[in-house]
Design a protein with these regions (language model features):
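Active-site-proximal alpha-helix that buttresses catalytic centers in soluble enzyme cores
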Residues: 2, 7-73
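Generic beta-sheet signal
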Residues: 3, 137-146
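Short active-site segment of divalent metal-dependent hydrolases/proteases
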Residues: 11, 147-148
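Acidic, low-complexity terminal tails and accessory targeting/binding regions
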Residues: 38-44, 73, 78, 84-96, ...
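Glycine-rich phosphate-binding loop signature in dinucleotide/nucleotide-binding domains
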Residues: 45-48, 130-137
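Short beta-strand scaffold positions
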Residues: 54-55, 121, 142-143
Length: 195
């Protein structure tokens, strides 16, 4: 079983550093182009993919749709377990606004955001269910930066600490009971095109 993990393409809020969380912001034109570049890469890749699944937020759904159409594979119904972390009061704020309102310890304050443990629990449940329901399939999952970061922490503890980039591609392989990264946070498809 392989799972390809993709962070959605760029949005206007990504450009200005606003936390999106569950706010349903669409891709911008650059984000759509990024998704097409990744789809082109996946069409030429050594792996074959059977399904694409995404969260229910439009930035992930549109990214997933572009990829599924290009690869001619089914797009599964959205799964709410892979939605971005809820950031509560922090959603829609820039770094400067967060610092002004709550100081540099805003992450430690109770501002209504979902905890790391809650995000990790639903991430691991999703992986478990996918490995049981689709044990002989290779699945592409389009999700969100904070969700993916927490998934990697749940699986690999502190080994992977890079910022998860828009349209980054990670491949995890499950052998026996263990997940191993074959590729991590790769954006080669964007760098080759300077997007």
């Amino acid at each position: 079983l392989l799972i390809g993990l993709i962070r959605h393409g760029q949005t206007d809020w990504n450009l200005i550093g606003k936390i999106q969380g569950r706010t349903d912001i669409p891709l911008n034109e650059n984000g759509r182009n990024q998704a097409k570049l990744l789809a082109d890469r996946l069409a030429r890749d050594m792996f074959t993919w059977d399904y694409v699944i995404s969260s229910g937020l439009q930035r992930a759904e549109e990214t997933a749709s572009i990829i599924a159409n290009a690869l001619h594979v089914p797009l599964l119904p959205p799964d709410e377990r892979i939605i971005e972390r809820s950031y509560g009061q922090v959603e829609g704020t820039t770094q400067e606004e967060r610092m002004t309102r709550w100081g540099d310890q805003w992450r430690e304050r109770d501002l209504g955001q979902e905890t790391n443990e809650e995000v990790r629990a639903r991430a691991m449940q999703f992986l478990q269910d996918m490995s049981e329901q689709h044990s002989n399939a290779n699945i592409l999952m389009v999700s969100h930066g904070s969700f993916l970061a927490q998934l990697y922490l749940a699986l690999f503890q502190e080994r992977y600490q890079e910022n998860i980039k828009n349209l980054s591609f990670t491949v995890l392989e499950k052998k026996d009971l263990h997940w191993s990264p074959i590729l991590y946070n790769c954006t080669r498809h964007l760098e080759e095109s300077n997007v």
